[in-house]
Amino acid sequence: MLEFKKFTDFPRGMMYEILADAYSYDERNKAVWDDNWHESDDFFYDNPEIAEKYGLVTCLDGYPIGFVTWDPRQRPEYVEIGHNAIREAYKRQGYGHMQLAEAISRIKKYEGLKRIIVCTNSKLIAPKNYESVGFVLYDRKANNTDSAYNGEYLYYEISLE
């Protein structure tokens, strides 16, 4: 059974573990993003009041297979999707779509919100997932960072006006 739980239902390190697994298809990801993954995990577990409001963990039969976070600090202009990951073994089975749809449903409840935004890379599978829940591409930029192998930056939005 698929259900959505709080980060605080799981021990510290779970977010990092899922990110490392979700991006394990290319060893360069860990080299580039490992510090960010640890920092994100630490932030959410050091701030449980934030973790409970601005993210969810997707569980299949009680096992955490993914998660998504969002940053509401720019409301009412926009809320930005942060990390959005599904363990490698559970990709391409619809779980990422369901996870993102649940997050969008929760975010849309913010009164007066104008947009939901996200940035991803062109060579990931994520663009198709974002488009499947209603995000529309509004900009793209060159990626001249250490993660350039993942393709250019794609900027998506859902307009709520």
Model region roles, listed by residue range:
Residues 3, 9, 20-45:
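Conserved GNAT-fold acetyl-CoA-binding loop/helix
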Residues 45-52:
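Short loop/turn motifs at secondary-structure junctions and domain boundaries
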Residues 86, 92-105, 131-132:
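Conserved acetyl-CoA-binding loop-helix of GNAT-fold acetyltransferases
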Residues 131-140:
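Conserved acetyl-CoA-binding loop of GNAT-fold acetyltransferases
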